[in-house]
Amino acid sequence: MFVDNIKLKVKSGKGGQGCVSFRREKFVVKGGPDGGDGGKGGDVIVECDKNTHTLSHYKGRKLLKAKNGRPGEGRKKHGANGEDLILKVPPGTVIKNAETGEVLLDMKEDGERKVLLEGGRGGLGNWHFRGPRNQTPRYAQPGEEGQELEIVLELKLIADVGLVGFPNAGKSTLISTLSNARPEIANYEFTTLTPKLGVVRVDEYRSFVMADIPGIIEGAHEGKGLGIEFLKHIERTSTILYMIDLSSYRDPVYQFKTLQKELKEYSEKLASRDYAIALTKCDSVEVEKIEEFFEKLGISKTEPKFKADPNLPCHFDDKTFVLPISSVANINIEALKFALFDLVEKNKRKENEENSF
């Protein structure tokens, strides 16, 4: 479990100014006041959206504002209301007051909409202030100020994709290339000593969460190396990406079979989870080494998808994919991102169907 926090300021719109106006028409010498009311300022509304998976689209945004109401006009015309600010958040997001820590909203259901801050009321036009003693009021109300608040959006994340590989297989480099995570990276084993999560953005609203897990060694299920502790972290991931280091002294097929064995020894359920294979550091070996991996495991080569490099062997089907990549040389990184997102979405749909029965 990983908690994503975003702190930002939000402000509702100011109400529009009331209008000072008098009726001016032919043959009407002393028309009375007819100034319209200002429009209401826009609200700050939080909307729960199941198609939004993370809070990454709010990163780096310090202040978000709803629109102000428009001023009133003559002939008692009401000013237009300001446009609401809609904050789209994934289910499970909690909104807190940044200063006090008080929970303001708890968003759970898809489609749920709640007003966080109301916009300011529009000012009254001068026609409201006419009376026997003052039939030509030359003042109108100003619009009410909007409300401003610093909030914290908090979301508990479970990784969609767990990266599984031997130490120094390129997991940290990949997650830092694809996401906003910045793990420590160096050319020695066991750089990653704790699991790190990164949010991989596919577009403005779609994203998935990737976990960089400490490298597995033989005997991990017995607690060797960093052992059982990190295997717990991938139990709840929906998809496993095996990271096979083509430049390693360990044979690629041996790496894959050993990693599968370690997961199976720890948990049959974990080993049976949907997976894909990334053949890392492909720029450091000849194509023949990649083809040899395909042949030894009986993997058929298919047409590339997601604009993968057509000069490198790859495999795509409805359940999995095998893709050579290089984070450093930026080979097939975009293809990997879209292929993983496609796999994660398929797994989520399958899980929802199973839970509905």
UniProtKB/Swiss-Prot annotation:
NCBIfam families: Obg_CgtA, PRK12297.1, PRK12299.1. GTP binds at residues 165-172, 190-194, 212-215, 280-283, 326-328. Residues 1-158 form the Obg domain. Its cofactor is Mg(2+). Monomer. Its EC number is 3.6.5.-. Mg(2+) binds at residues 172, 192. An essential GTPase which binds GTP, GDP and possibly (p)ppGpp with moderate affinity, with high nucleotide exchange rates and a fairly low GTP hydrolysis rate. Plays a role in control of the cell cycle, stress response, ribosome biogenesis and in those bacteria that undergo differentiation, in morphogenesis control. Belongs to the TRAFAC class OBG-HflX-like GTPase superfamily. OBG GTPase family. InterPro entries: G_OBG, GTP-bd, GTP-bd_Obg/CgtA, GTP1-OBG_CS, GTP1_OBG_dom, GTP1_OBG_dom_sf, OBG_GTPase, P-loop_NTPase. Keywords: Cytoplasm, GTP-binding, Hydrolase, Magnesium, Metal-binding, Nucleotide-binding. The gene is obg. One of its GO terms (biological process) is ribosome biogenesis. It is found in: Cytoplasm. GO terms for molecular function: GTP binding; GTPase activity; magnesium ion binding. The keyword GTP-binding applies. One of its GO terms (cellular component) is cytoplasm. This is GTPase Obg. It comes from Nautilia profundicola (strain ATCC BAA-1463 / DSM 18972 / AmH). It comes from the Bacteria. Residues 159-345 form the OBG-type G domain.
